A protein has these predicted regions:
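Conserved alpha/beta-domain cores
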Residues: 1-187, 191-211, 219, 231-233
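Gly/Pro- and small hydrophobic-enriched strand-loop and loop-to-helix capping segments
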Residues: 221-239
Length: 240
């Protein structure tokens, strides 16, 4: 499947929105409480700008270079942009001011670096803490038991506000197992909110992608990150 035309993207987003709404209602939730984040990794600014006319709530970027290029080109057309990939400390400065939310904070080292750059810029940066719920070595994210020390560290920062959690459960063809992972993340989300940390407001639970976003919504996600189902297969030859 190649990259989609605008009309194909429109049809895809309509179908995704319908599935999102159905999953929310099935769980007794308001469909309006779940945001659609378009993961636009490797897409050109023209494609991103065209998709901005669709009912997409926010754009998510995995690479700092692409965030900068699309933001500076005005490709998001006024819609929020989030950073959802692994963030290197030497690139934080470029993300601040371009990403309204950094979804992938997974260490005290990264927290401290964001705090330092945000203080220099005179801003408060919103972040999510990323949880590696499956304990996979191939993925970033903090283990569930290390979430609490990370929250302690985040609460002490003056220029960071934690707005929730992000997770990528293991790819699993077992629907029940997938939902168990998602439910575990939701439990952490609720527990974190109940602990009353300073500078922490558990508002956003980012989980669910093209293959499992309906399950994620059933298990409490407030934001789902979808790329391939919107844009088609990625053409990595277009990016260095």
């Amino acid at each position: 499947m190649a990259e989609k035309t605008l009309e194909e993207m429109r049809e895809a987003v309509e179908e995704i929105r319908a599935k999102m709404a159905a999953a929310a209602r099935e769980a007794g939730r308001d469909p309006a409480a779940v945001q659609l984040c378009a993961a636009c990794k490797t897409r050109t600014a023209d494609i991103v700008a065209a998709s901005a006319a669709l009912p997409i709530d926010v754009f998510g970027e995995n690479h700092v270079q692409e965030l900068c290029a699309n933001f500076d080109a005005g490709a998001y057309c006024g819609k929020p942009s989030h950073f959802i990939g692994h963030l290197q400390t030497n690139k934080i400065k470029k993300v601040l001011g371009r990403a309204s939310l950094i979804q992938s904070v997974d260490s005290e080292h990264l927290l401290a670096a964001i705090e330092k750059e945000a203080a220099k810029a005179g801003i408060v940066q919103n972040v999510l803490l990323e949880v590696n719920i499956g304990g996979e070595e191939s993925k970033t994210g903090v283990s569930p038991d290390r979430l609490w020390p990370l929250l302690d560290a985040a609460a002490a920062q003056e220029h960071i506000r934690v707005k929730g959690l992000m997770a990528i459960p293991p790819v699993n063809n077992d629907d029940a197992q997938n939902r168990r992972y998602l439910a575990q993340v939701y439990k952490l989300f609720v527990q974190a909110g109940e602990r009353g940390y300073q500078n922490v407001a558990m508002e956003t639970l980012s989980m669910g992608m093209s293959g499992d976003f309906e399950n994620a919504i059933r298990e409490g996600a407030t934001l789902v990150r979808i790329g391939t189902a919107i844009y088609g297969e990625r053409d990595y030859s277009k990016k260095a």
